[in-house]
UniProtKB/Swiss-Prot annotation:
Positions contributing to ADP binding: 21-25, 156, 187-189, 213, 215-217
Xref: NCBIfam families: PFKA_ATP (TIGR02482), PRK03202.1 (NF002872)
Function: Catalyzes the phosphorylation of D-fructose 6-phosphate to fructose 1,6-bisphosphate by ATP, the first committing step of glycolysis.
Assigned protein family: Belongs to the phosphofructokinase type A (PFKA) family. ATP-dependent PFK group I subfamily. Prokaryotic clade 'B1' sub-subfamily.
InterPro entries to which the protein is assigned, alphabetical: ATP_PFK, ATP_PFK_prok-type, PFKA_ATP_prok, Phosphofructokinase_CS, Phosphofructokinase_dom, PKF_sf
Lineage summary: Bacteria, Bacillati, Bacillota, Bacilli, Bacillales
Known catalytic reactions: beta-D-fructose 6-phosphate + ATP = beta-D-fructose 1,6-bisphosphate + ADP + H(+)
Quaternary state and interactors: Homotetramer.
UniProt main location, coarse: cytoplasm
Residues that coordinate or bind substrate: 127-129, 164, 171-173, 224, 245, 251-254
Protein name: ATP-dependent 6-phosphofructokinase
Matching Pfam families: PFK (PF00365)
Cell division in keyword set: no
Active site: 129 (proton acceptor)
Length: 322
């Protein structure tokens, strides 16, 4: 293994830069040349590939976003398009590709490994949604969680001052981990998740019970994958006469300097990805399970159609929100 490339793809997440830094410095330490692919898979097509040096990743571990940039590239699903991307790697003698991103990014890496046996591919889970199989946590999840906690703590101040119910919508299309972990952390009165069939009438009854006990305000945490915050508010007011406000946190969840936990996770996974390439591994995603570094074949990651839902944590959140 003499040359590798690294790219970031899909939605950005805090800690991607730390992962690129770890890949780059681990490779250089092992006398491997590193190339950065700018603009994700689109950069592979456009030949936007440039050599990275130690200085290229200096002063990046604390930066949010990705200095390699990211872009959606739906045309990468086409075989002719992928051939062009593979040729751009081949002509530089690149033997390994590290892809940092989510499920769609992994699928692109798998295609490359299938269609070009001389190019090894390793995926690193980078998404705030924490929805990738093969790992307990994805890069960016912890930072996004802390961003939500900080925001909702401030929202609760104004909710308390005006005796209002705030519906807070957070990211999470298919996986409600952000809503679940944040809801437990901020003491939300109710958490609405895509993994759980929630009757809004029950939510209204719970809020009403709290009002009867003297509670003046409530926080309802909603993952975007099951309904919008506004839809939740509209449904609630059909059953109970309360003053509601909706707060959609949106892309603020993706930004900001990565937390210490995300910097460490990204560094560990980035270094491990290079080690796997050195060992001749390919078509695998790296991860962390029980604080141990692991690797899982892409086929197995895709076969697990549903991540294991933490029902125990959900039940605890319900018990603590009485």
């Amino acid at each position: 293994m003499k040359k590798i490339a690294v790219l970031t793809s899909g939605g950005d997440s805090p800690g991607m830069n730390a992962a690129v830094r770890a890949v780059t410095r681990t490779a250089i330490y092992n006398n491997i040349e590193v190339y950065g692919v700018y603009q994700g898979y689109q950069g592979l097509l456009d030949d936007d590939i440039h050599k990275l040096e130690l200085g290229s990743v200096g002063d990046t571990i604390q930066r949010g976003g990705t200095f390699l940039f990211s872009a959606r590239c739906p045309q990468f699903k086409e075989e002719d398009v992928r051939k062009k991307a593979i040729e751009n790697l081949r002509k530089r003698g690149i033997e390994g590709l590290v892809v940092i991103g989510g499920d769609g990014s992994y699928r692109g890496a798998q295609r490359i490994s299938e269609e070009c046996k001389e190019i090894q591919t390793i995926g690193i889970p980078g998404t705030i949604d924490n929805d990738i199989n093969g790992t307990d946590f994805t890069i960016g999840f912890d930072t996004a969680l802390n961003t939500i906690i900080e925001s909702v703590d401030k929202i609760r101040d104004t909710a308390s001052s005006h005796a209002r119910t705030f519906i807070v919508e957070v990211m999470g299309r298919d996986c409600g981990d952000l809503a679940l972990w944040a809801g437990l952390s901020v003491g939300a009165e109710t958490i609405v998740l895509p993994e759980v069939n929630t009757d809004i009438k029950d939510v209204a009854e719970k809020i009403e019970q709290g009002i009867k006990r003297g509670k003046k305000h409530s926080i309802v945490m909603v993952a975007e994958g099951c309904m919008s915050g506004q839809e939740c508010a509209d449904e609630l007011t059909k059953y109970i006469n309360i003053d509601t406000r909706v707060s959609v946190l949106g892309h603020i969840q993706r930004g900001g300097s990565p937390s210490g936990a995300d910097r460490v996770l990204a560094s560990r996974l980035g270094g491990y990805a290079v080690e796997l390439l050195k060992q001749g591994e390919t078509a695998k995603g790296v991860g962390i399970r029980n604080n141990q570094l692991t690797s899982t074949p892409f086929d197995e990651i895709f076969a697990e159609s549903d991540r294991k839902f933490n029902s125990q944590m959900y039940e605890l959140a319900k018990e603590l929100s009485i």
